[in-house]
Amino acid sequence: MSVHPDLHQHYVWACQSTGQPENPLIACVLQEADKNHITRWTKGVTLKIAGNNHLVPVQRVTDDDFQVLASVLHNAVFVTGLDLRCNVLTDAGAKHMATFLQDNSALRYLNLMFNDIGTSGAELIAGALHRNETLLHLRMTGNKIGNKGGMFFASMLQMNSTLEKLDLGDCDMGPQCLIAIATALTHNKSIKAINLNRPLLYSHEEETTVHVSLMLKTNSSLVELHLGKHDMKNFGVEQLCEALYKNSSLRYLDLSCNKITCDGVKFLGELLKQNQALEILDLSANCIEDAGAIYLSEALALYNRTLRALSIVSSNIKGKGLVALSGAMKTNTELSHIYIWGNKFDEATCMAFSELIQMGRLKPDCTDVEPYEVDGHVHLAELSHGLQKHYYWTPSCEVVMSKDANASLAIAAVSEY
């Protein structure tokens, strides 16, 4: 089967033998994989059985559907990725997935985002990863595993030495498991990227940020860290910055959708004057205002030559701050990507960024604005570009190759790409 893959035929036989009706979505994807196997299977193939795919018949994958599929893929060593996002897998399906992960020695990428997996399902999947030595990238985004489910993944991180990317964003985790995960990462040497976006926090003391900061002081393997929607304030940013003076590995820091003001950005500006590791900084949807933008522009113009991408989308910045950042780009040639939409553009801002684009200093693919002229006045229109435009969805009509739009510039690509 690994030499001459015929996934669809095996799926038909498996459905007939178990009495399970064929799922049209699975059948369509397997037929397409069989058709393309000559050029693709030797490098490994990712089966994209996403329940939000509008170009093929969509009957979302159930627990019973996946049980049959798992039996088909048991010996398919050329299948190295499995995308099951936006289906209806529950804890029962997670049990089948755990068995599959224990027996499978080929899968490197698994996307389970936005299914219906809960705490017991998280326990089973995390338990399977205690022994799995193949999987590199796991996305659990949007499954409501809760604080207890997150604790099982924290325990897994103490045992697993293979997993490189773990996405636990929007999983309703609480402060206890965030602290446990941060503690586990003080010893885990394999995780390169972790997403902890949107936990459920009930305290204003920012204990979780303090523990993440302590972890960053000792962790030398983490490259990408997402702390969006953490209700983080200036105190939390100060703690992170103190840790990052001693950290030389983190290259992508996501602090979007927090409560950071210009005073917090001042700490980041001072950090950028000395830090020689950060390449991507996401400050979208904070309230950094002109003063914060000026702090950043001073650091970028005079000191920092490492940062390559900056997002300040919807950060309540006006013309003075935006013009200052455009001026920094004229002297800092390393900063190649900047995203500014959602701020308050005046004519000076429009002129400044139009000039950067026309002179070739800022490439159209590296920003989210495009200049146009009406009655002799320059304006800026929005472009669909950004650091994580395709975090929750992937366009069905095209293959998105740009790392700038999908994730990090810096982290090494794994099986998802």
Where are these regions (language model features)?
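Leucine-rich tandem repeat or coiled-coil scaffolds
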Residues: M1-Y417
